[in-house]
Amino acid sequence: MKFTLEDQVVLITGGSQGLGKEFAKKYYNEAENTKIIIVSRSEARLLDTCNEIRIEAHLRRETTDEGQVQHKLAAPLDLEQRLFYYPCDLSCYESVECLFNALRDLDLLPTQTLCCAGGAVPKLFRGLSGHELNLGMDINYKTTLNVAHQIALAEQTKEHHLIIFSSATALYPFVGYSQYAPAKAAIKSLVAILRQELTNFRISCVYPGNFESEGFTVEQLTKPEITKLIEGPSDAIPCKQACDIIAKSLARGDDDVFTDFVGWMIMGMDLGLTAKKSRFVPLQWIFGVLSNILVVPFYMVGCSWYIRKWFRENDGKKAN
């Protein structure tokens, strides 16, 4: 199933910011016959996003903006309109059912779905609140689980491209990401199972590295120094660049997608009983085997030493 921007009905969760918002812009600007539905919890942010995308497009094309537009997904549907929003708590299964009932009633069941909703609260485990722990599973796993299940029920015979966003931390979890990485690892397992069960679907999984977004800026406020030390001097790439890399990889046929070379290397070292569907898979396996023998043992010893040393020197900060 070829990835294309044109002639689609695309559902984008987490569409009011970050990569979800960037993909909504990409579909709106580069396709002419695609309907785009963005979903998140905040109706105000969704409306702002729709207006921003529409106005930016008119400025780019030097055309006149059509003024106030009813972007909210509801009947009667303007057949000329291409961008819609639907406020929904995707962590609540009943709310997702209502979303798909609305899509079904309006004959807008998606042909492509991008599950972009998510976010991290990087802190040491003792410093997290119960609310933050629950939020990690709600927005990083349940949002995708609920949407994927409804799509599977709605599209039992038709082809569908389901694009799920995990994280490089699913392949290499480390200190500071206890609220986030386990949920993203669960996404990785879910993808492996859905690829076996949903034979009429193309299922892609994206493992982004750091990219500039509102969420990334907020994460830096709570991220422990030891987390930054292990991450290394990895600069966040622009969100648009990450979006373009992902779209290009999907169009090329890759179904395990990375935004940087580090992610590709880490997946090579993640040897397991799941099929790899990334670029240069044979080379990735060879690299992974050699790295696991020659590099990983020494790296992990050094990493463990740095973590223990940091905690000894920052004994009073263990809950921060």
UniProtKB/Swiss-Prot annotation:
A motif (GXSXG) lies at residues 14-18. The chain crosses the membrane at residues 255-275, 280-300. Pathway: Lipid metabolism; sphingolipid metabolism. It is a multi-pass membrane protein. NADPH binds at residues 14, 16, 18, 41, 45, 89-90. The active site is at residues 166, 180, 184. InterPro entries: KDSR-like, NAD(P)-bd_dom_sf, SDR_fam. Disulfide bonds: none annotated. NADP(+) binds at residues 11, 19, 89, 180, 184, 213. One of its GO terms (biological process) is sphingolipid biosynthetic process. Disruption phenotype: Inviability of the knockout mutant is rescued by addition of phytosphingosine (PHS) to the growth medium. Residues 1-254, 301-320 are cytoplasmic. It catalyses: sphinganine + NADP(+) = 3-oxosphinganine + NADPH + H(+). Keywords: Endoplasmic reticulum, Lipid metabolism, Membrane, NADP, Nucleotide-binding, Oxidoreductase, Sphingolipid metabolism, Transmembrane, Transmembrane helix. It is found in: Endoplasmic reticulum membrane. Present with 7700 molecules/cell in log phase SD medium. Catalyzes the reduction of 3'-oxosphinganine (3-ketodihydrosphingosine/KDS) to sphinganine (dihydrosphingosine/DHS), the second step of de novo sphingolipid biosynthesis. Belongs to the short-chain dehydrogenases/reductases (SDR) family. Dimer or tetramer. This is 3-ketodihydrosphingosine reductase TSC10. The lineage of its organism: Eukaryota, Fungi, Dikarya, Ascomycota, Saccharomycotina. The gene is TSC10.
